[in-house]
């Protein structure tokens, strides 16, 4: 499993995943946000588990946005409209878990945290073969994107 120090080292470089300049990631972000707005318009409370620097988090359609991020370095780059929390605080209309349900993370604990914190929607994203063992409730929509090069 990836250590906190490895995460800190990874985030020494701003936008280490190149999300802000990779067309596939920009498209996926736009797609997620469009689907979420179509489902509910604006959520009261949203939680992004593993928010990183807030690439998607900052634009979530919610009045109150919380983020859980283990890397202090990444969390320092979270935008002002996002409040960092160490654990979920109550229930959230929307819980976002993207790129996190993988073996290098404690994926079972993350999946449990997401289902426990959600009162309405859980939006998950990642490599589909790694997502299959999880049940988050009724599947509303499912989409598959090609993995970026």
Predicted regions mapped to residue ranges:
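Conserved class I S-adenosyl-L-methionine
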Residues: 1-38, 43-52
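A short acidic, Gly/Pro-enriched loop at the edge of an enzyme's catalytic core
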Residues: 88-94
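A short SAM/SAH-binding and catalytic strip from SAM-dependent methyltransferases
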Residues: 94-107
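Class I S-adenosylmethionine-dependent transferase superfamily signal
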Residues: 113-117
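Conserved Class I S-adenosyl-L-methionine
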Residues: 134-148
């Amino acid at each position: 499993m990836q250590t906190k120090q490895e995460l800190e080292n990874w985030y020494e470089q701003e936008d280490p995943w190149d999300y802000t300049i990779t067309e596939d990631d920009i498209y996926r972000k736009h797609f997620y946000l469009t689907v979420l707005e179509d489902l509910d318009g604006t959520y009261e409370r949203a939680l992004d588990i593993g928010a990183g620097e807030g690439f998607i988090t900052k634009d979530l359609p919610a009045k109150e946005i919380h983020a859980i991020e283990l890397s202090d370095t990444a969390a320092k780059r979270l935008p002002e409209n996002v409040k960092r929390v160490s654990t979920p605080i109550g229930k959230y209309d929307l819980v976002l878990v993207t790129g996190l349900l993988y073996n290098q993370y404690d994926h079972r604990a993350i999946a449990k945290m997401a289902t426990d914190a959600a009162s309405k929607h859980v939006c998950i994203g990642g490599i589909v073969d790694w997502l299959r063992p999880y049940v988050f409730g009724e599947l509303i929509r499912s989409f598959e994107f090609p993995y970026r090069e």
